[in-house]
């Protein structure tokens, strides 16, 4: 089963489209590991997948603590995503992807700015060989995202002027990406990009809560998966916070107009 279908099955099974960003503030490796393990255990009934970032990879090590957390997630039937934003030459990109896949990650996030040939082609090739997924950044959630993702570009093929994010959405379709990251902080961009990507490339939206994005607006605009970090991991009651996000998203999905 492809990563995209594994995500659909996990969401269906958990009755949740919430992806936990397992991000914690710096601490000793021992404390980070223990807190992550507990968090994952208490929050897992409300999520469909877990996204890891450098917050844990750097202090815990990929094949040490992180691999144990990956096994824990897998035991709960939760796919895992490595948010490594791959962004180098092809040979390096392939090695990065291979390491994360060998450790047990089900998907990696990559940056389409580097292009296909000797860029992301080797990553998609490796993912195909190992039956894993690749999710592309299409419009990030932070304030300065417009400087890169929002700039006007003239495409080589048609000479037409487009926004960088529109070009990236076309690439996500052409390259067979398993998902596209579009910030929940820009619901109008989600709407626009959903009309290009349709359901072929599901939208993953980070930026909910701590960055000001709203989960209902992301649902209404066409996002499929909702990535939440600090608003859960640093909440007084992480399980309750996750449950609240899950319920809000499910309610908004039920009331979503059919044109989205
Ligand atoms: P938080 O909910 O705490 O803001 O965390 C969001 C997570 O998603 C972080 O791991 C961040 O690096 C990641 N992320 C993001 O916030 N915006 C993007 O456009 C892409 C991301 O991967």
Where are these regions (language model features)?
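Conserved N-terminal beta1-alpha1 strand-loop-helix module at the mouth
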Residues: 1-81, 155-167, 171, 177, ...
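Conserved, mostly hydrophobic/aromatic
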Residues: 20, 50, 83, 108, ...
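Active-site beta-loop-alpha junctions enriched in small/polar residues
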Residues: 21-27, 53-57, 85-89, 113, ...
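Conserved anion-binding
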Residues: 24-26, 88-181, 200
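Active-site-adjacent beta->alpha loops and helix N-cap segments on the catalytic face
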Residues: 56-72, 89-95, 112-132, 184-197, ...
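Short beta-strand/loop segments at the ligand-binding rim of alpha/beta enzyme cores
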Residues: 73-85, 131-134, 196-206
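A C-terminal functional module that forms or caps the active site or interfaces directly
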Residues: 180, 184-232
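C-terminal helical cap(s) of enzyme catalytic domains, especially alpha/beta-barrels
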Residues: 216-222, 230-260
């Amino acid at each position: 089963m492809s990563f995209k279908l594994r995500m659909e099955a996990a969401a269906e099974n958990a009755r949740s489209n919430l992806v936990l960003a397992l991000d914690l503030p710096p601490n000793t490796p021992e404390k980070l590991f223990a807190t992550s393990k507990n968090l994952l255990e208490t929050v897992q009934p409300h999520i469909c997948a877990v996204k890891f970032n450098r917050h844990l990879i750097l202090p815990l090590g990929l094949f040490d603590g992180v691999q144990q957390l990956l096994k824990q997630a897998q035991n709960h039937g939760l796919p895992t995503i490595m948010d490594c934003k791959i962004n180098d030459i092809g040979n390096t990109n392939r090695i990065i992807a291979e390491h994360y896949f060998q450790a047990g990650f089900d998907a990696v996030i990559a940056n389409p700015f580097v292009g296909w040939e000797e860029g992301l082609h080797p990553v998609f090739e490796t993912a195909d060989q190992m039956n894993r997924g690749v999710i592309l950044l299409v419009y990030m959630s932070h304030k300065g995202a417009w400087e890169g993702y929002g700039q006007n570009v003239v495409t080589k093929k048609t000479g037409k002027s487009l926004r960088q994010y529109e070009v990236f959405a076309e690439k996500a379709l052409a390259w067979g990406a398993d998902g596209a990251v579009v910030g929940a902080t820009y619901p109008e961009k989600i709407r626009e990009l959903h009309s290009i990507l349709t359901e072929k490339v599901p939208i993953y939206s980070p930026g909910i809560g701590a960055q000001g994005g709203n989960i209902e607006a992301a649902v209404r605009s066409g996002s499929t998966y909702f990535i939440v970090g600090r608003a859960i991991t640093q909440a007084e009651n992480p399980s309750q916070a996750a449950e609240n996000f899950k319920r809000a998203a499910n309610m908004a999905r039920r009331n979503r107009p059919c044109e989205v």
